[in-house]
């Protein structure tokens, strides 16, 4: 508790230069699952040596280990970033004593923020789940979906429809969520006039971008930002490029690069919005690196890279963090992933 108080005081100090009457900032948190520097570089070299991340105002490095393991998984790292505590691999939204902890999304919601989550995995996958769910096993997808149904998140977009309407317990959560409207396409999502919308994009896991996944992440994010902005309230938006990680596990560079390119295009759209809005803090990082990827050859002229992997699992290497917008200087430096929560909380409670 004392550590938390000291950290909040330290993080609040740069905020004193802003007026006490200044409007609460929007926060867009973007996570490239499995996205290390080599994944970013592979996407960049495959895109005429350019990445939208070059537009970031501040850059740092993040330590990713879990409570008892040097190599984290997405559940533990997601919980660290979302709630500021270390926990065991596989555990979502609970500390090392299995005590539920409040996430930054839940704190922002309780402060009057609009909230939204978008993922290119199922919406009940470990990283998005860590922002609204409390379970001992990341694989308890039915329970995670049940907790999402009671979370009061305004907008959620991702795969995994079967965990809502084709469940072992025979419940149909979509019918139970009578205060939500459910979209069946991006066009339908855009048309619906409601402050609570679910868009379950695939019955199970979404396919990869290289396999033709639609709608695109950038289109889903732009549509969601437009909805959030229309309520004239601050908002918290979590965006996960989930399948950079999946390609890394398969040592499949086509999958990795196609996901990286889509994530990078989405970063560009988010930066465009933030630069125009002038009251949106954007934070972009990864939960961990996947595959131990190295770029060993290639050709800039042809935008080609030759990659090698040392693993089909996660690694313990630090991952980068990028930021833009008001208070983005807070995210400079080298620090633990739990401090991302501390810094975001300091912005919200200022």
Regions inferred by a protein language model and the residue ranges of each:
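Bacterial Sec-dependent N-terminal signal peptides
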Residues: 1-21
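N-terminal catalytic scaffold of extracellular/periplasmic and nuclease hydrolases
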Residues: 20-167, 172-189, 289-350
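Structural motif
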Residues: 29, 199-201, 236-240, 283
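Metal-dependent active-site segment of extracytoplasmic phospho-/sulfohydrolases and closely related
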Residues: 37, 259-300
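Gly-rich Lys/Arg/Thr-decorated short loops/hinges at beta-loop-alpha junctions or inter-strand turns
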Residues: 84-88, 198-209, 245-250, 322-324
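Functional beta-strand-loop-alpha-helix junction segments that form "active/interaction loops"
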Residues: 95, 183-221
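Short amphipathic alpha-helices and their capping/turn segments at secondary-structure boundaries
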Residues: 105-109, 187-191, 221-231
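Active-site His/acidic residue clusters
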Residues: 126-132, 204-212, 221-225, 229-234, ...
């Amino acid at each position: 508790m004392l550590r938390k108080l000291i950290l909040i005081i330290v993080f609040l100090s740069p905020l004193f230069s802003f007026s006490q009457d200044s409007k609460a900032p929007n926060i867009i948190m973007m996570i490239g699952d499995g996205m290390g520097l080599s994944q970013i570089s592979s996407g960049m070299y495959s895109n005429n040596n350019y990445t939208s991340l070059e537009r970031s105002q501040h850059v740092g490095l993040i330590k990713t280990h879990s409570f008892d393991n040097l190599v984290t998984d997405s559940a533990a790292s997601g919980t660290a970033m979302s709630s500021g505590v270390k926990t065991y691999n596989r555990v979502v939204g609970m500390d090392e004593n299995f005590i539920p902890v409040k996430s930054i999304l839940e704190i922002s919601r309780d402060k009057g923020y609009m909230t939204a989550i978008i993922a290119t995995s199922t919406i009940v996958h470990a990283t998005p789940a860590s922002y609204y769910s409390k379970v001992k096993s990341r694989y308890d997808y039915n329970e995670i979906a049940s907790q999402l149904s009671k979370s009061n998140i305004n907008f959620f977009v991702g795969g995994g429809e079967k965990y809502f309407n084709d469940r072992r317990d025979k419940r149909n959560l979509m019918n139970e969520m009578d205060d939500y409207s459910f979209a069946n396409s991006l066009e339908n999502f855009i048309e619906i006039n409601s402050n609570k919308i679910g868009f379950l994009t695939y019955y199970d896991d979404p396919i990869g971008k290289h396999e033709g996944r639609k709608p695109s992440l950038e289109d889903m994010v732009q549509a969601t930002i437009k909805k959030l902005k229309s309520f004239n309230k601050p908002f918290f938006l979590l965006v996960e490029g989930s399948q950079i990680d999946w390609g890394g596990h398969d040592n499949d560079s086509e999958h990795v690069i196609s996901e990286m390119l889509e994530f990078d295009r989405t970063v560009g759209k988010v930066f465009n919005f933030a630069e125009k809005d002038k009251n949106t803090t954007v934070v972009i990082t990864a939960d961990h690196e996947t595959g131990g990827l190295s770029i060993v050859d290639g050709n800039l002229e042809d935008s080609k890279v030759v990659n090698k992997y040392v693993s089909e699992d996660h690694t313990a290497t630090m991952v980068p963090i990028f930021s833009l917008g008001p208070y983005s200087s807070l995210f400079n430096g080298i620090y633990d992933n739990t401090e991302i929560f501390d810094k975001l909380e300091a912005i919200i409670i200022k």
